[in-house]
C-alpha cells in the first residue's frame, strides 16, 4: 500500500468508526508504525481534512 492509499484507508477507517481510533490501532490496521500514522494525519489535516485529536485517538467530527 502506498502513501496515498494508506491515507485513503485512514480516512475510511475513521469515517466508519463510532469512537476515536488511536494511532496505534490505525497503524496495526495499515501495517505501518504509529509514527507514520501521526505523519499521515498531519498531512491530511494540513490538506484541509477535519480530523480531531482527542485523548483517546483521532475522530472525524
Describe the residue ranges of each PLM region.
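Key DNA-contact positions within bacterial/archaeal DNA-binding proteins
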Residues: 35
